[in-house]
Amino acid sequence: LQKYEYHVPFYRQIQQYRHLGMKGLTESTLDGWFKKTVELLKPLYEELEREVFSCDYVQADETTVPVINREKHRADKEYLWMVRSVMEKLAIFHYDGGSRAGAVIESLANQYNFKGYLQCDGFAGYETAFKANPDVRLLNCLVHIRRHFEQALDENREMAQHALTQIQYIYKIERQCDETGLSYDERRLKRQELARPIMEAMKVWMETEGIKYSPGSQIGKAITYAYTRWDNMMECLEDGRLLWDNNLAENVIRPITLGRKNYLFCGNHEACLLYTSPSP
């Protein structure tokens, strides 16, 4: 609980125990207990992993973790992955030597023969991993697309604001669906009726207006980013369960960010691997 809920490093836990009169407890003792506990939890973690990938709609995200490189006497920026089953609200963390390569998530999905929707941010590694796999249908994140247009407001307010307004309309439709308590199928039909024309018009707008701006400009970058992911976003029109953004996945990762501020780094790759195993 102290380590995973409150993100308290072992050395600080020992200080707390000493204040309570337990002066013989050492960091190596806690570390030993921790490793044995992780070993006992391993079958449960593997079953959770299987359960997540047996679902047909998951979200994935990655976050950084500093890991000490003793040869170079520095902390290297490594990556750990999170995969969340949206409908079942289960999540797992995965560490593969700190790699952010798309092969990591591809290997995980293949290991459990995953078939379904995988929602992610705009990281190109997902596209590389699954572009040749017809069983995995990628979704992207409308919030990430919106952020790029927000960054272009100062450079080209008219163009950026047009895109932001269309995205706002899409979320307004979703709020109406939420407020009226529509079923997933009713939501799909409502999206087909109201959101599809917006999505299709936006695609045409990007095709016709995007070529007028330099790819190096802020608005050019925003349009390119959105356009290359727009077909993936269109998947949301076909299934009322699908979300327009990856926000819930980022919420799952947020405690890791908090922990990173407390423990600062992992001592080695093994420590990071141990850290991810019981995280769910």
Model-derived regions, located:
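Conserved beta-strand -> loop -> alpha-helix junction used to position metal-binding or nucleic-acid-contacting
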Residues: G122, N133-H162
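Gly/Pro-rich turn-and-neighbor structural signature
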Residues: Y11-L108, Y184-M234
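Short, conserved catalytic/metal-binding motifs centered on acidic residues
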Residues: Q13, D61-T63, L118-D121, H144, ...
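Basic, short loop/linker segments at the boundary and entry of helix-turn-helix/winged-helix-like folds
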Residues: L1-Y4, M22-L25, A271
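Short active-site loop/helix that positions an aromatic residue
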Residues: Y126-A132
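Conserved small/polar residues in nucleotide/adenosyl-binding loops
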Residues: Y275-P280
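Short, contiguous acidic/charged loop-to-helix segments that flank catalytic cores in large enzymes
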Residues: G240-L243, N262-L273
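Short amphipathic alpha-helical "interface-anchor" segments enriched in bulky aromatics
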Residues: L142-F149, W244-L258
